[in-house]
Amino acid sequence: MTDSSQDLRVFMIGPMGSGKSTVGRILAGLLDCDFVDSDAEIEARCGADIPWIFDVEGETGFRRREAAVLSELAQRPKVVIATGGGAVVTEINRQLMSETGVVVYLEVSVEQQLKRTGSGEGRPLLAKGDREETLRKLMEEREPLYQGLADLIISASGGNARRVARQIQEQLAAQSLLPLVAD
């Protein structure tokens, strides 16, 4: 975990549909930081969308790209980074995030994920089979990783995105990870 607000990096982790990008973008505004969605960055660099990368390179190829992008993003000062839901499955990503920034886990129920992810279009891991079963399986596998990595755990199930972002900002300030800034 970083202790310098001059070098603040916030990594948003959590399952798909937890609000990492939406809350992260708002949080970046509150903290006067840049915002980057790692999946969008991967797509921009690759010139293809995530489902195509999964189809052509498989999850292993995608995770390799993800690790490279996260490694570069972790060198930027004052940035909020929304990671993909599976970024935590790779040991090197977990180590990178814990050593270079503050890790915020947005906790959300599978029921909320189902509502927020809609048909699952554009989400390769939901493309086949029963969506609820897949989400429950992913949660079972990843929840211990999210919990173990997180510096802050914030419920994103009921609140609106701005309220969740404000709660994160207040928790960061309470833990002396940044000054409390009025917006």
Regions found by a protein language model. Give the residues of each.
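A glycine- and Lys/Arg-enriched "phosphate-lid" helix/loop adjacent to the NTP-binding pocket
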Residues: E99-P144
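Short glycine-rich anion-binding loops that position phosphate/pyrophosphate groups of nucleotides
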Residues: G85-A87, S109-E111, G159-N160
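Conserved lysine of the Walker
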Residues: K20
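Hydrophobic anchor at the beta1->P-loop junction of P-loop NTPases
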Residues: M12
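P-loop (Walker A) phosphate-binding loop of NTP-binding proteins
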Residues: P15
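NTP-dependent small-molecule kinase module
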Residues: M1-S5, I26, L30, R76, ...
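ATP-dependent small-molecule kinase phosphotransfer cores
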Residues: D37-S98, R123, R136, L145
